[in-house]
Swiss-Prot record:
GO term, biological process aspect, one: DNA recombination
Keyword set, alphabetical order: Cytoplasm, DNA damage, DNA recombination, DNA repair, DNA-binding, Endonuclease, Hydrolase, Magnesium, Metal-binding, Nuclease
Lineage: Bacteria, Pseudomonadati, Pseudomonadota, Alphaproteobacteria, Hyphomicrobiales
Pfam families per UniProt: RuvC
Identification of the protein by name: Crossover junction endodeoxyribonuclease RuvC
Native source species: Allorhizobium ampelinum (strain ATCC BAA-846 / DSM 112012 / S4) (Agrobacterium vitis (strain S4))
Primary location class: cytoplasm
Cellular component GO terms, alphabetical: cytoplasm; Holliday junction resolvase complex
Known EC number: 3.1.21.10
Catalytic activity of the protein: Endonucleolytic cleavage at a junction such as a reciprocal single-stranded crossover between two homologous DNA duplexes (Holliday junction)
Active-site residues (renumbered): D11, E71, D143
Gene from which this protein is expressed: ruvC
Residues bound to Mg(2+) 1: D11, D143
Amino acid sequence: MTSAIRIIGIDPGLRRTGWGVIETLGNSLRFIASGTVMSDGDMDLASRLCQLHDGLADVVHLHQPDEAAVEQTFVNKDAVATLKLGQARGIAMLVPARAGLPVAEYAPNAVKKSVIGVGHGDKQQIHMMLKILMPKAEFKGNDAADALAIAICHAHNRGGERMRRALAG
């Protein structure tokens, strides 16, 4: 008999990094927890990255996921903001990798398509589908909701070739 796989989805951001933990067994999804790790905007960049690292490390230690999924970042017109987001994303990938978890990456439109059926939807559609897919899901804010959507996307796609290679090491 196969056991449930616990997945952490991470929505990286320098101010707020959302996280969501679910379990999947076959086609069923079960909400475990979600939240947001915050960094202090008055602190220097290195200290803010440490806050994100330590907060995510605490979440991974507490919830003991088996696999992780992180949303890929997009490039916007503000190069400095894009670089900072990339650094936060590096932390979001490093923490689960250091815990020995395979880490998958998903584009934002792939996450939306997996959860709401189309690649371009709004936050309200994601919130509604999260409640349909996992009626007991609790999330405060878009970052935690997005992280749960990333975890669901991974649950739906974890059998893919790229993930099989990551799991094989």
